Amino acid sequence: MAGTMPLRPTYVGFVRDTTDALLIFEACLSGTLSHVPRRPHDRERQDLIKSGNIFVYEEHASGIKRWTDSISWSPSRILGNYLLYRELEKPFPPGEKKRARGRNGKSTTQSGGISKARQRNTVPFPQGLEHGNEYPSVPSDDERHLVGSLVDSYDFKEQGLVKKTISITYQGVPHHLVSYYNVEDVKAGLLSGPSDDPRLRGVVPRTELMNGQNFRAPVEEAMGGSYMPSMVASIGYPTLQHQSQMHQSQMHQPQMHQPQMHQSQMHQSQMHQPQMHQPQAHQPQVHQPQVHPPQVHQPQAHQPQYQSQTLHPTHGYQQTYAGQPNAPSSTWW
């Protein structure tokens, strides 16, 4: 029955980081979004394998062991918790090992996942565009977040697709996400992420999805697998609002440190502050002469000294003696 129903992508947009993928996985587990029941048929691939389409399938229920889409892809490269593939201009010849191009345009042989160059070029690698690759040989940071290290190692198709995959295990069952996008579509802001989708605003990944996975990088540190729209603002592309990135930006914004002056430093600062000398106005001292109260001379009343008078015993008149003032010159008797 599932094979007769038309196949639709689980989601249309762009998964920037691990958190975006976990939102889609959680939405599928909770019934907000739907797993795809099968792989696309050959007649459906042209309409389904295109930029923006994201497919999530559960390995046991769908019976899908390997996702196929009839596109020639480069070998995978790790970017955060994702695997990246880029569309090739033409497939590798049958039976030939996949060989990466060296910087001088020569091919290299892969053995055990390690590439060894056949020839090394001593001439500095040109900064121009490689044949079949629209990206410069030294990519910018925003291109690294979209194509990883798949820059000029193979003969990539111009305006080709990038495939981005990630897997989780929930209750012992593997779930896989396969995303397709065109680099220019992401740069132009044509593909929004699940964090911007109002339908998924209330979706919160369950604890088993956040902590129970064997991710290469912790979820909060897996920004190496994301594309930061703010990185392309300087080259004129519109940016997207990403709620989780905005939240992390607020959390990691540098705080302006206000140095607090230590008490001893404050004391020293107070000690070393120049003191403004305020001249004290000289107050003239007014000499107050001490007023000596006039001493009032109190004349002492002269007490007349009375001389004892001796009356003459016979006559009764005053008797004087010679030598005393007013003494008579002679005696009368």
Curated annotation (Swiss-Prot):
Superkingdom per UniProt: Eukaryota
InterPro entries per record: Gti1/Pac2
Signal peptide extent: none
Induction conditions: Regulates its own expression in a negative feedback loop.
Pfam families: Gti1_Pac2
GO MF annotations in UniProt: DNA binding
Subcellular location: Nucleus
Keywords from the UniProt entry: Activator, Nucleus, Transcription, Transcription regulation
Name listed for the protein in its UniProt record: Global transcription regulator sge1
Source organism: Gibberella fujikuroi (strain CBS 195.34 / IMI 58289 / NRRL A-6831) (Bakanae and foot rot disease fungus)
Lineage of the species this protein comes from: Eukaryota, Fungi, Dikarya, Ascomycota, Pezizomycotina
